[in-house]
Amino acid sequence: MRYVSNLPHAVKEEEHVVVPARDGTRLSARVWRPVSSDTEPVPGVLEYIPYRKRDLSAVRDSIHHPYLAGHGYACVRVDLRGTGESEGVLADEYLEQEQTDAEDVLAWLAEQPWCDGNTGMMGISWGAFAALQTAARRPPSLRAVVLASFTDDRYADDMHYMGGALLSDNLAEAGTMFAYATCPPDPALVGERWRDMWHERMENTRPWILNWLRHQRRDDYWRHASVCEDYSAVQVPVLASSGWADGYSNAVTRVLEHLDVPRKGLVGPWSHKYPHLGEPGPAIGYLQEVVRWWDHWLKGVDNGVMDGPMLQAWMQDSVPPSTSYEERPGRWVGEPSWPSPHITPVSRALLRHRIAATGPAPTAGEPMTVQSPLSVGQFAGKWASYNAPPDLPYDQREEDGGSLVFDTEPLTEPVEILGSPSVELDLTVSEPVATVAARISDVAPDGSATRVTYGVLNLTHRAGTGEPELLEPGRRYRATVQLNGVAQAFPPGHRIRLSLSTSYWPLVWPAPRPARLSVYEGTSTLTLPVRPTAEPDELPQQPFGEPEGCPPLASTQVTAPEERWEVRRDLIGYRSALEIVKDRGTVRIDDIGLDTGLRAEERYTATADDFTSVAGETAWTMRFTRDDWDVRVETRTRMRCSEEEFHVDATLDGYEGGRRVFSRTWNETVPRDAL
């Protein structure tokens, strides 16, 4: 990244500005704005997230907010109620209270003497969710939004559930927010109230996973703040982006298809990162694109930002399998609209061990049967990759050993796909609850298999309504597995492989009992969204500038970070474990003399093929120290199951000066609901 300090406007920063909510709660904002805005008001841009602007998100914030301010915008970074230095308690994600607060912040922003009354919202992940959800409420000052790595569907396309199956990232994210929601504010900003605010948070926070587990089907809990329930509610222009390695790769094309506002989409090779920080690379000059977006929609500049294709996507070239990549080779392609007139769905029948060169047969052939071991999925990587070595999927050959596998013949010419593949299965199963995972891989001539995309379906959710229906063992059903969207080029000499398995642990929590899946050949099909290789890309080879931003906030790495991802197998007790460590080490924020430490551990275990032996555990430690101030929060969440129930054990401990000042435990049971 190129760091720039010479910007069109000199920038002033206010670290702690109080923003009143309508109920009297005081939210905390950090503001960057042009010095000239004292006399020449500018549009305001809000980023609204729970990740602690004072410390844990301070370095990232310092790259893009001063940059945008230097281009003529008042940028406001607000900690959600109950996080950072904002008062109150954060009880869950995307609550009505959160959105009401967002409306209050925008109203406050529009009324400031240095703001001209026009506002935008931007963010990645939670911040993008917040921007899209707030846009659907139509606050009067909001003119446009910028979204990165987001969803419009909280039930079907977030880290909780996928195809009606429970994702283990549900546990991981719950552990993350259990820790963030119980950290204290900094007394340097809030004074002696810090301790009371901290204890209020700890006293009133429950493990978020309990609520998420109690809503296992698409109900009003998930419908709330899912913009897909009413796309027409969004009436402002949308710039949407994500990455093919991210868990949130699908929403960009959905909002392009369903919104009826000016909109642009951008999907790169990235994991869960802003595009200017994108990994795997190439990262792009995203902030320059954001400035163009704001210039047009907040300032009325006629700069051609809406010219060119509606969707710009990185067409990924073939690569050997790896758990991380610095760069993904490929090229940018453009589509004039979405769905694109250039994309043709091509269906091919599944035959024994192969993908036919023709469409489905009129009658079914013999069934092909699989009952996968629990080990299938140990090399699946993370649902939402951060490109943190090694959280991308590894060589799929070991996974394929426990799967039904279908290959094309070696390709004689290149094949490119852009969009969401699907698999339609003519099937029977042996259990009333069963899961099927479908994977597409790029198989090289040496046999190595790189996963391209995947999808999961809890077959009780085959109707796609969010209301499960138990299966009748032995009965024939038709079910469609939707795979994640992707842009991928398969070269000549390679094969396209489809793999089907009945487990995908620990990415997906397994069904209550092992299930035997039978798939009928000829009447089961794979459909690929094929983009003709002769189609013009509609884009120059390098349509984006070099990534740039402001120099990051000065910080010092006091102790070394640690990243580990290990699969362990005990061949005596037939136990397996996936163990993950993400430790940022101790980082000192130089300007304020604050040391921060964050360590997260995840562990997923199973014994043999006992589907009720699986367990997941997360442990978080977050520490903040300065002079004689030393506090830390430790959380631990463990999830187990029987055939009928989930069991959750959780602990929360708060320490001040090395002494434990708060402790609470939870031991609760949640019934399984066709899951």
List the predicted regions and their residue ranges:
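Active-site-adjacent alpha-helix of alpha/beta-hydrolase-fold enzymes
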Residues: N250-R263
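N-terminal cap/lid segment of alpha/beta-hydrolase-fold proteins
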Residues: R2-D38, D407, L411-E413, D426, ...
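Glycine-rich nucleophile elbow surrounding the catalytic serine of serine-hydrolase chemistry
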Residues: I124-Q133
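Short beta-strand/loop motif that positions the catalytic acidic residue
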Residues: V234, A240-S242
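C-terminal, loop-rich substrate-recognition/catalytic regions characterized by aromatic stacking residues
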Residues: H276, P280-D653, R659-L675
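Accessory cap/linker subdomain of secreted extracellular hydrolases
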Residues: D61-S62, G70, Q133-A233
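Alpha/beta-hydrolase fold nucleophile elbow
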Residues: P113-S125
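Cap/lid segment of the alpha/beta-hydrolase catalytic domain
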Residues: V35-A110, M159-H160, P432, A438-D446, ...
